[in-house]
Amino acid sequence: MKLKHIIAVTVGAAALCAPSCDLDEKFYSEVTPDTFFTSPESTYAVLCRPFTHWKWYIGADRWYLQELTTDEMVCPKRGSDWYNSGEYYRLHYHTWSPDDRFVVNTYDGTTGGISRALEAKSDLQGVDYNAIGLNDAVKADHINQLNAITAYFYMRGLDYFGGMPIYYSVDDDLCARSTARETYAHIETLLKDAIPALSKKTTLGASEDGYIKQAAAAALLAQLYFNAVAYIGEEHFDECAEICRDIIGGVYGTYELDKTWYGPHCFDNNTSPEVIWTVPSENSKVEWNWYFKYFYHYSSYEYFGIETAGYNGFMLTPSLDTLIGGERLCVQLVQIEKHGERYDFDFSRADKDLRKKPYRYLGSRKYEGMFLVGDQTNPNNPSQQCLGQKEYSGKVINLVDQVARFSEVGTKYNSVAELTSTMADGEENSGVRLVKAPQPNLDDKLLRWNPDCPVIRLSEIYYMLAECELRAGDKKTAAGLINQVRGRNFEGGADPNPVTADNLDEYRMLDEWMIEFLGEGRRRTDLIRWDKFVTESWWDHTPLNDKNKNLFPIPNSAISANNLIEQNPGY
């Protein structure tokens, strides 16, 4: 069997799951230059295939594996909601299986992205670009964008599953998995070859469109080197640092840090000078919006002053357990063990952080705060209140930084002291919610879903370089790089607790990664790089100390489809 036959099966299965389709659309059995490629637009239609898949791939199941398995985010059972046969428990406790849908969908999505990129490359290689009003430089750019996005999908596969089957064409016969080192080398070659042929951003703040430019491909190569210690057991931090310095220095295009904390995430973030690669999103067109229903309460539309009810699922990992504290407008994000002592990953060292406010839309594209926490009355219209529908039916929801069955005190439990705080103990008001992508109100409803999803931004380059400097022993330089980003989070840049050579260690570095990139789908990878993913405790998670869990299992369905594929150790 050839790879393209697997593609057909995958695409067919995906079609059955699609929410809608155009039954009048015409399809052709094959794409040939004389029947399809008659204009420049036709080449972009083919180039877009893997990028459309990438837009879907960035969210949902991949995000779950990166965030809900870590100290950052969690999806507890809330009464009768969100148990889902224990699949979210398995993420939190690291007891997933080869048949769990998040694992299956991620493996299929990864290989599907690779196959779509290879298929598009095969179609475009035979096109005479000059004959349709383009030129050879544009063709080289297109082909190498496809090489770069192929490398992206292979790197995600390497991160999630280890060595992947390596294909060069959709006509290749099915093959066994290559080793992690071979997969790493393949990714490196694809990116090194692609970078020189890609276009370069020359205007600061020019709108990003989702396509891959030189800086994006260079950043992907930097990521590969950055995580080499986890991927292949070798340190390549020096190579990563060199690329990061070049990106910051403008070698691969014109970028700079945004002057505000919200710039990379706002309604017009496609023009932020910081964004390097984004998933485009625009109201009523191509909308990137999967996250909304999963994060927010059933009635959160009242708080936001907008339509659309939520599913009330995901939340920041709780820090208060069963303690009833005073009002908190910050999130003590996580507690893990540090050398036998409790250590908090939190915002408490930065109480003047401009992000540490309840989210509020101010009108005219402006907003403040990054969290839903506390009383969920609309701050702009007190008559709109987020009312409970379950344990707190008819009452204004008060989101708390804790998980426990407080509604059952006096009935099932005599006092708060008897409560437990586990994945089974959530209520509808449990947990602080993240608002990384802003929401307008009905007056500005056409702005909804306009924020693009930033996949790579310059802050990440600064942080990668900082960690490389830390590992090289230059804590002062590392601290300076982090502080260049941190400063914008405080009024007038007055950071009450900047990073210094004295307070910077592996835990503070991980802390800074989480605070800046909270909810951006990278936490698992950062923990693995520091050997913390399977060795540390947080909230209801006890470490298994099983390094096999740094990788997910190959789905049984993938092994059944290709019996040359072997399972990962420990599964």
Language model: regions and residue ranges:
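C-terminal substrate/ligand-recognition segments
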Residues: 100, 104, 362-485
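An aromatic- and glycine-enriched ligand-binding surface/loop that stacks and positions planar moieties
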Residues: 22-85, 192-193, 215-404
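Bacterial Sec-dependent N-terminal signal peptides
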Residues: 3, 17-41, 151, 187, ...
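Long, intrinsically disordered, low-complexity segments
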Residues: 20-23, 82, 97, 110-113, ...
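Short coil/turn linking the two alpha-helices of tandem helical-hairpin repeats
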Residues: 156-160, 165, 202, 227-233, ...
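Conserved, well-structured interaction surfaces
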Residues: 37-48, 52-57, 80-161, 173-185, ...
